[in-house]
Regions:
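Intrinsically disordered, low-complexity, mixed-charge
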Residues: 1-99
Length: 99
């Protein structure tokens, strides 16, 4: 169903205690579980950025799953910003990038 749904791509910036807590691994796990593509990386300023591409339903499920998989959502870490960005053609997987 993901292939027929209208795709969107969103850049999320996660803030708070997000590095060295498994956030990148959790993003990969959640995105793949929802059939989403994109990437995630640690930033030098201590945040974690992810670009996630797929249906709006998949995006919501990704965030919901992520908030339960990484302890402390709302108290120790949160979504600092989310911004629509351009779609990436022919992207097939979700992975970790380096800055």
């Amino acid at each position: 169903m993901e292939s027929t749904a209208r795709k969107e791509r969103v850049r999320y910036v996660f803030v708070g205690r997000v590095q060295n807590r498994g956030v990148r691994f959790a993003c990969v796990t959640c995105a793949r579980k929802e059939g989403l593509t994109g990437w995630v990386r640690n930033e030098r300023n201590g945040t974690v950025t992810a670009e996630v591409q797929g249906s709006s339903t998949g995006q919501l499920a990704f965030l919901r799953r992520l908030s339960t998989l990484v302890p402390g959502f709302g108290d120790n870490w949160s979504v600092g910003s989310e911004k629509p960005v351009s779609l990436v053609d022919d992207e097939r997987d979700f992975g970790v990038r380096r800055y």
